[in-house]
């Protein structure tokens, strides 16, 4: 019985130890969100972004809420499959965002620049879209991105790279 008690005490001490296990050391790497490449072709050039993807309804509901910053070439993609009329607001969003509503042909249907933090006013293109892309507020203007510009993502955006994703968006080139 003493041997069992000693093992239990040792196990409790080990479990409460503050030294990280091998799994804990890897936790920040696992916690880092995977990104998806997006390329936007505009009159002023081609621009690449590496964005997070909000796939689930829960991820889409949270979006970029509570973020204090966003990388210049970062953002978040909200895929709509099947395409639908999407409406977004900025409640609990701390930073301004550019919202790009993307037609099923890959063109930007509507661009809401610098959506105001904490606003409860809905933002929508008013038509079904394939996705909404959120970028750091003002970034679209900095790069000359406008309505009518064309997007692709996943392996279609960077065909020279091997992208392991089921989120390839390959609209037909403009005629």
Model regions: which residues?
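C-terminal motif of bacterial Sec signal peptides marking the signal peptidase cleavage site
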Residues: 13-15
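Sec-dependent signal peptide recognition
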Residues: 2-9
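Residue-level signal for mature regions of secreted extracellular proteins and peptides
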Residues: 9-10, 163
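Compact, glycine-rich, soluble single-domain proteins
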Residues: 17-175
């Amino acid at each position: 019985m003493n041997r069992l008690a000693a093992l239990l005490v040792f196990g409790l001490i080990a479990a409460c130890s503050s030294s990280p296990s091998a799994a804990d050391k890897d936790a920040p790497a696992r916690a880092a969100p995977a990104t998806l490449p997006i390329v936007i072709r505009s009159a002023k050039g081609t621009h690449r972004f590496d964005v997070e993807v909000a796939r689930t309804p829960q991820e889409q509901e949270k979006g970029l809420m509570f973020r204090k910053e966003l990388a210049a070439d970062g953002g978040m993609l909200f895929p709509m499959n099947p395409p639908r009329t999407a409406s977004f607001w900025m409640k609990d969003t701390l930073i301004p965002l550019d919202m790009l509503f993307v037609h099923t042909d890959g063109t930007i249907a509507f661009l809401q620049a610098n959506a105001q933090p904490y606003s409860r006013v809905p933002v929508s293109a008013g038509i079904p879209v394939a996705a909404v892309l959120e970028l750091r507020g003002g970034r679209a203007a900095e790069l000359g991105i406008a309505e009518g510009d064309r997007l692709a993502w996943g392996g279609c955006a960077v065909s020279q790279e091997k992208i392991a994703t089921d989120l390839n968006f390959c609209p037909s080139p403009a005629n």
